[in-house]
Amino acid sequence: LLRGRLSGTFEYYIQKTTDLLQSVSLPSTSGVSSYMANVGKTENKGFEFTLNGTILDNHNGWTWEASLNLSANRNKLTELASGSNDDKANNWFVGPPIDCSYDYEKVGLWNSDDPDFQYLDILEPGGNEGMIKVKYTGDRDASGKPTRAIGPEDRQIISLEPKFQGGFSTRVAYKGFDLNVITAFRCGGKLISTLHHSNGYLNMLTGRRGQVDVDYWTPENKGAKYPKPGGIQSGDNPKYGSTLGYFDSSYWKVRNITLGYNFEKQAWLTRMGIQSLRAYLSVQNPFIICSPFHKETGLDPETNSYGNENVAVTEGIQKRFLTVGTNSPSTRNYLFGINLTF
């Protein structure tokens, strides 16, 4: 299009997988942690889109090119080999994505001005103001009173998949100089922070760990994110502490910036027998443009290891889940280089 200055591709796919091989978790009493088995069938649907454009083509010495790529994938588990509709021990449910979490859904903290606070003793026996409030899915009587306490049946299927993801890159050149910028983005989905999860360190608000500086609930700070220290405990953590580990995984980051200069047709190069010389300076992962997770924690939101690859995580996170936090983060690297052609 536009005399070759605009081009692109679009691909749509449907992929069906049978006899899917996965690691199946076993109870600790079995003596074996897991085994490999064909667990069922999955289906992936999605698209991949690319658009390349030349905005300036040697206009007064200026060249400007840009490229956009976009992709989206929808995964679902269509069948379990056992014939059942779910395997809750392994977080497998027919219909949702195979990599989904099965956990309580945090809706806030309990406060005295909450309409349900009058039912706190029913929903959370022994509970207190300032503790984590999770979604209740049970029945209520005619007056709106809950019929039972919150329990395992209130856990939700939480999809970790993004709505879409992709990248944008651009190149600007002028009289031997060139600047390349590569960015990546992700919209929607959830990431799991091992620092904030139930096996992390930022929600253990007991003992000496109560000295961690987080935004926790007090009578003067009822809009806090973290619960009141000293409430109902689940091990070393506040009850429902795992819900603090889920974050919006959206981000837009600069992945690479490279500035270079090409020494061409230089007499001193010819005398040295050098046909061409290029010098460049590059930086990887220089900064995050926007990210809810980065704004709160200062960490890079790009997940880079699975639960079973993270030595700081011993339980509570499925091995196939991408995590960020106590693993090795994306690093910022600076590189200077010279390319010579003789």
Where are each of the predicted segments found?
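Hydrophobic, lipid-facing positions within transmembrane beta-strands of outer-membrane proteins
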Residues: 45-51, 64-66, 164-170, 177, ...
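Transmembrane beta-barrel architecture of outer-membrane proteins
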Residues: 12-18, 32-33, 41-47, 70-76, ...
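Conserved small-residue
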Residues: 37, 43, 56-160, 200, ...
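Membrane-embedded beta-barrel scaffold of Gram-negative outer-membrane proteins
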Residues: 1-31, 64, 71, 75
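Transmembrane beta-barrel strands of outer-membrane/channel proteins
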Residues: 8-14, 66-72, 172, 181-185, ...
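Extracytoplasmic gating/loop element in the C-terminal half of outer-membrane beta-barrel translocons
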Residues: 186-278, 282-284
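C-terminal beta-signal and terminal closure region of outer-membrane beta-barrel proteins
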Residues: 39-46, 90-115, 216-222, 239, ...
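Outer-membrane beta-barrel proteins
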Residues: 3-4, 16, 51-59, 64-66, ...
